[in-house]
Amino acid sequence: MSQLCPCGSALEYSSCCQRYLSGAELAPGPSQLMRSRYSAFVMKDADYLIKTWHPSCQAQTFRAELEKGFSQTEWLGLTLFASDERRVPNEGFASFVARFNDNNRPGAIIERSRFLKENGQWYYIDGTRPLIGRNDPCPCGSGKKFKKCCGQ
């Protein structure tokens, strides 16, 4: 059996994000780009990450820092819980929780990422991180309090 895609889609990697990371296809929308970028972090593919950051971010300038993070971070899972791709042409959003261990310490990134489409390609531009109280419902949709879920 083939390897499942790290993005959490429950599809085989060869039928999911591999086509984007290999350059065979461009991600068709923000949610697919979000998933493929998460897979690139898992696969330690700095080239793909840099290629999919918006050119204004000058991602090439922090390649060394990115690659250093690969050796310290183990990615544990992605939950994409909201996507808004059609309100403004050429701009889209994807909200997610990405769980990880960094130097054996658990953590989570909770973000609403913003993507821009230029010349037919979607790029990650930036993101905002919500302020979540420990007793607030977890934004991943589990129904648990944040402190008992992604906030651990």
Curated annotation (Swiss-Prot):
Q: Which InterPro entries match?
A: NTF2-like_dom_sf (IPR032710), SEC_C_motif (IPR004027), UPF0225 (IPR023006), YchJ-like_M (IPR048469)
Known PANTHER family for this protein? ADENYLATE CYCLASE-ASSOCIATED CAP C-TERMINAL DOMAIN-CONTAINING PROTEIN, UPF0225 PROTEIN SCO1677
Q: Which family does it belong to?
A: Belongs to the UPF0225 family.
Q: What is this protein called?
A: UPF0225 protein KPK_2103
Organism from which the protein derives: Klebsiella pneumoniae (strain 342)
